Amino acid sequence: MELEKHTHLGKATEYPEEYSPSWLTPIPRAKSRETLGLSGKPDFVGEDLWNGYELSWLNSKGKPEVALGVFRIRCDSLNIIESKSFKLYLNSFNQSRFTSREEVEALMRKDLSAAAQGEVSVTLLSVTDWRDEPSFWRDAENLDVLDIDVDVYTPDASLLPDPVGDDVVEETLSSDLLKSNCPVTGQPDWATLYIHYRGKPLEKAALLKYIVSMRSHQDFHEHCVESVYLTLMQRYQPEKLAVYARYTRRGGLDINPLRSNYPLAADNFKLPRQ
């Protein structure tokens, strides 16, 4: 699949005036997963949590309504949804009339599930309904205070040393230094990366260097998280592992992929850059 031909990315686009699900562009997960050595159903679980901040439609009398959208796409769906197409799809509601928020919610659930070829949860919140969520991720130890020398800016698992000893720890780590790039436009994507694990201790300076090594990598948010998850799982085989990235907002959307080897929902908390 040639992404440049089949997506809206990098192209001038007229914004829609009428609701249509045809704006949604699905991209098979399998294509990027092949580059990670994955075929068939992956061993991890998780979801892609999207927040939509620019969402509006007209009620039956023509008065605008606004909402915040929370969309959860399971990682075992066949497709991701390309982000600009998601934005255009949401914009297509702007001048269309609907009888209720519940009608819009049900329609989005149907359209997004069809595009993703998997279950999608949709929750529309009024501006006054939204509340920040508590989360254990907020207590993560931030690695960015470490003073490291860096000269590798493409993903390099060899930066991670082999595990040493038999000690077992359980801890949550984070870094605000994750940067990856859109595979079509090259536009930078910025995120805070979280890692929770139980297993042999990770060498923290080396882990930070590995995170920084993603800096020139080109891939979608979802697959960057899967790459980090698989690298850590294959190298250290921890008993528990969860990798969660909260990306900064673009086009009224932020994308927050979570991958783990145990059941875990993506907490929807806000960071200063979101």
Curated annotation (Swiss-Prot):
Q: Which GO terms describe its molecular function?
A: preQ1 synthase activity
Pathway field = tRNA modification; tRNA-queuosine biosynthesis
The record's catalysed reaction(s) read: 7-aminomethyl-7-carbaguanine + 2 NADP(+) = 7-cyano-7-deazaguanine + 2 NADPH + 3 H(+)
Residues of the active site are: 182, 189
Q: Is Chaperone found in the keyword set?
A: no
Which InterPro entries does the annotation name? Answer: GTP-CH-I_C/QueF (IPR043133), NADPH_dep_7-cyano-7-deazaG_red (IPR050084), QueF (IPR029500), QueF_N (IPR029139), QueF_type2 (IPR016428)
| Disulfide-bonded cysteines | none
**Which residues are listed for substrate binding in this entry?**
81-83, 221-222
User: Which residues participate in NADPH binding?
Assistant: 83-84, 250-251
What EC number(s) has UniProt assigned to this enzyme?
Answer: 1.7.1.13
The UniProt record lists the keyword Oxidoreductase: yes
GO process annotations (BP): queuosine biosynthetic process; tRNA modification
Enumerate the Pfam families for this protein: QueF (PF14489), QueF_N (PF14819)
Sorted alphabetically, the Gene Ontology cellular component annotations on this record are:
cytoplasm
Query: Which domain of life does the protein's organism represent?
Result: Bacteria
- Protein location: Cytoplasm
Question: What keywords were assigned to this record?
Answer: Cytoplasm, NADP, Oxidoreductase, Queuosine biosynthesis
Q: Which family does it belong to?
A: Belongs to the GTP cyclohydrolase I family. QueF type 2 subfamily.
Record's function text: Catalyzes the NADPH-dependent reduction of 7-cyano-7-deazaguanine (preQ0) to 7-aminomethyl-7-deazaguanine (preQ1).
The record's annotation in PANTHER family points to:
NADPH-DEPENDENT 7-CYANO-7-DEAZAGUANINE REDUCTASE
Q: How does it assemble?
A: Homodimer.
Name the chain's protein: NADPH-dependent 7-cyano-7-deazaguanine reductase
